Design a protein with these regions (language model features):
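Helix-to-loop junction immediately C-terminal to a conserved catalytic motif
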Residues: 40
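Conserved ABC ATPase "signature" region
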Residues: 95-112
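Conserved ABC ATPase signature
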Residues: 117-121, 125
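ABC ATPase C-loop
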Residues: 134-135
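Catalytic Walker B motif of ABC-type/P-loop ATPase nucleotide-binding domains
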Residues: 142-145
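Helix N-cap at the start of a conserved alpha-helix in ABC-type nucleotide-binding domains
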Residues: 153-155
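H-loop/switch region of ABC-family ATPase nucleotide-binding domains
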Residues: 177-178
Length: 237
């Protein structure tokens, strides 16, 4: 797919991720967020399109977890926020209630938090509420857009493990990040984007051991990647 605003942002980007956790990494301005929004059905590509199992993606098919939980929390109560997506899909009241209960239980939201205003939540509670809203919408796929940025260790771990679990359950999972290190233990593949183009689409092992990929994507190479590369080179000398 390709997309342009005042100038081209994406050029012939293809990412397949059914049942996988694919990490899309790139520097600021590389086109990551545009790719995420197309994948979630929020905007249309100028050429090409987003599909899941050959089916065109609609906004209601994909749950999207944004960097800022506040961008997903705007109703009078957390329960209403979680129900927003299923209600918009036209689900029956019973189905909406079941989805809200499932999503809340999965991220550990109790009844007190469910009845609270989003404005009163702590940072960790807000992230869990946003995750629950994402889960309630995630019919086929989930997009995490810088969803671990600024989180403490516990909240970050919850996001990462949830993403892995969703992929294991057969959903397509796309994680957008500028820092690939924390996602590598959970990922199946890593796609490196630079100036709107895919410069590498590799398995996790290669992303952990090949510094040249990071150079091609104009990214700082994580120290552990350089160390592993040197160790492997030494083993083959």
């Amino acid at each position: 797919m390709s997309h342009a605003f005042d100038k081209p942002v994406l050029h012939d980007v293809t990412i397949s991720s059914t049942g996988e956790l694919v990490v899309l990494v790139g520097a600021s301005g590389s086109g990551k967020t545009t790719c995420a929004r197309i994948a979630a059905g929020l905007i249309e590509a100028d050429t090409g399109h987003a599909t899941i199992d050959a089916r065109l993606v609609c906004p209601g098919d994909v749950g999207m977890c944004f960097q800022r939980p506040q961008d997903q929390l705007f109703a009078q109560s957390v329960a209403e926020d979680i129900a927003f997506g299923p209600n918009n899909k036209g689900f029956s009241p019973d189905d909406v209630e079941a989805l809200v209960a499932y999503a809340a239980a999965r991220v550990g939201l109790d009844q007190q938090v469910m009845g609270a205003s989003p404005l009163t939540l702590s940072g960790g509670q807000a992230r869990r509420a946003a995750l629950a809203g994402t889960l309630a919408c995630a019919t086929y796929a989930v997009v995490f857009d810088e969803a671990t940025s600024g989180l403490d260790g516990e909240a970050r771990s919850q996001v990462l493990h949830l993403a892995r679990e969703l992929a294991n359950e057969g959903k397509a999972v796309l994680a957008i990040t500028h820092d690939v290190s924390e996602w590598l233990p959970f990922a199946d593949r890593v796609v490196f984007l630079e100036k709107g183009r895919v410069v590498a689409d590799v398995n996790v092992q290669e992303a952990q051991t090949n510094p040249e990929i990071y150079e091609a994507a104009q990214l700082d190479c994580p120290l552990f990647v350089s160390v592993l590369h040197e160790l492997l080179e030494a083993c083959y000398v």
